Swiss-Prot record:
Gene Ontology annotations for the cellular component aspect, listed alphabetically: cytosolic large ribosomal subunit
Keywords: Ribonucleoprotein, Ribosomal protein
Protein name: Large ribosomal subunit protein bL28
HAMAP family attached to this UniProt entry: Ribosomal_bL28
Matches recorded under InterPro entries: Ribosomal_bL28 (IPR026569), Ribosomal_bL28/bL31-like_sf (IPR034704), Ribosomal_bL28_bact-type (IPR001383), Ribosomal_bL28_sf (IPR037147)
UniProt GO BP: translation
Assigned protein family: Belongs to the bacterial ribosomal protein bL28 family.
GN (gene name): rpmB
Pfam family, any one: Ribosomal_L28
Annotated region described as Disordered, given as residue ranges: 1-21
Disulfide bonds: none
UniProt superkingdom: Bacteria
Keyword Transmembrane attributed: no
Length: 78
């Protein structure tokens, strides 16, 4: 399972760790992904999405029905 948010599309990015001596070593910054079940009232069932916490805020703002409709329009299976 890839580390990609289904709502926002956030994915891991790369950068550097910096020590006190300013030595750079490569590292990955991972998105804060959560597996979360959302209740779809129109379909009377739960859908499980892998979303970042930013994605959860978007769902709170727009509503799960709108977000699921956008996912289906993009061709994602929900």
């Amino acid at each position: 399972m890839s580390r990609v948010c289904q709502v926002t599309g956030k994915r891991p990015m790369v950068g550097n760790n910096r020590s006190h001596a300013k030595n750079a070593t490569r590292r990955r910054f991972l998105p804060n992904l959560q597996n979360h079940r959302f209740w779809l009232e129109t379909e009377k069932r739960f859908v499980q999405l892998r979303v970042s916490t930013k994605g959860m805020r978007i769902i709170d703002k727009k509503g799960i029905e709108v977000v699921v409709a956008e996912l289906r329009a993009r061709g994602e299976k929900v």
